[in-house]
């Protein structure tokens, strides 16, 4: 009996020792998941950790919280989150209350809400904005954002400023007509009372945390391909400068979209895909990041 007990104890010890490399080692350590900051040429963010660069793998819409300790992104049509703890970054965990095939996930500055676009009736193709809020035991069920977002068309390209004001794109209403474009929804008294159309022509707006500049996707003759990233600066009077192409260090022969600006405004995260608009569920896409110093006047950094 004693010999059998010793065998059991040895087996348990073996399992414990064997588990140390798996469970004892953190997923990643350090700011930005321990990644070396990029230069002026865009590079894949956290390859092998966040981005799986193999064909037909899809990561998109990477976004950090204001303190840099929470990172949200989409992988194969699901939304994931990883958080920086005293032991390092946790392994990405899927937010189970966020449905499959959601789009444009975006993290609030305090990391207590995740915003996204979703359609509960795919036959109508009416994608509307929702959010899930952090609770004591996980995340809430999706909640609509209020009557200001009631619309017969579809929303896309969601982004969020540090003050919870929303910037997003919406298509033309069902049946045609006006009403599409990039919109701004100011956050007032814990809600978004109205949407204001901006004089900008593009999609997938990505706003800086302090709303001082925006990067969006547009189709223009000077682009390297049909869709490129463009930068516009917000003037002191609230108007926007003419958007300019961000150039070949960022744009490529593929599709660039879904810009997200880091909390310190030093870096831009975006998604590059080899065929997002051709087949959005079977393409290859990765999250990239790039230093913005070359692109921003000193007063905007």
Predicted regions and their residues:
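Bacterial N-terminal signal peptides that target proteins for export
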Residues: 1-10
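Bacterial N-terminal signal peptides
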Residues: 10-19
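Short, conserved micro-motifs composed of acidic
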Residues: 24-301
């Amino acid at each position: 009996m004693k010999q059998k007990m010793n065998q059991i104890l040895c087996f348990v010890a073996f399992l414990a020792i064997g588990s140390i490399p798996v469970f004892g080692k953190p997923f990643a350590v350090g700011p930005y998941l321990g990644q070396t900051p990029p230069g002026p040429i865009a590079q894949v963010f956290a390859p092998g950790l966040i981005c799986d660069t193999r064909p037909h793998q899809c990561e998109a819409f990477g976004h950090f919280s204001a303190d840099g300790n929470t990172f949200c992104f989409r992988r194969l049509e699901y939304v994931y989150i990883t958080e920086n703890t005293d032991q390092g970054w946790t392994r990405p965990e899927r937010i189970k209350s966020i449905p499959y095939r959601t789009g444009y996930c975006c993290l609030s500055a305090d990391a207590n809400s995740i915003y996204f676009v979703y359609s509960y009736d795919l036959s109508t193709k009416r994608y509307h904005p929702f959010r899930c809020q952090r609770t004591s035991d996980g995340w809430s069920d999706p909640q609509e954002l209020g009557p200001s977002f009631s619309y017969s068309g579809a929303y896309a390209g969601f982004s969020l400023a540090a003050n919870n004001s929303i910037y997003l794109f919406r298509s033309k209403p069902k049946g045609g007509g006006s009403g599409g474009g990039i919109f701004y929804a100011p956050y007032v008294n814990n809600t978004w009372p109205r949407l204001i159309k901006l004089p900008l022509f593009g999609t997938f707006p990505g706003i800086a945390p302090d709303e001082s500049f925006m990067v969006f996707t547009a189709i223009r003759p000077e682009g390297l391909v049909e869709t490129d990233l463009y930068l516009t600066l917000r003037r002191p009077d609230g108007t926007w400068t003419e958007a300019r192409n961000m150039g070949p260090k960022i744009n490529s022969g593929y599709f660039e979209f879904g810009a997200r600006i880091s909390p310190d405004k030093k870096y831009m995260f975006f998604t590059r895909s080899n065929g997002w608009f051709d087949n959005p569920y079977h393409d290859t896409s990765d999250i990239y990041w790039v230093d913005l110093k070359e692109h921003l006047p000193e007063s905007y950094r």
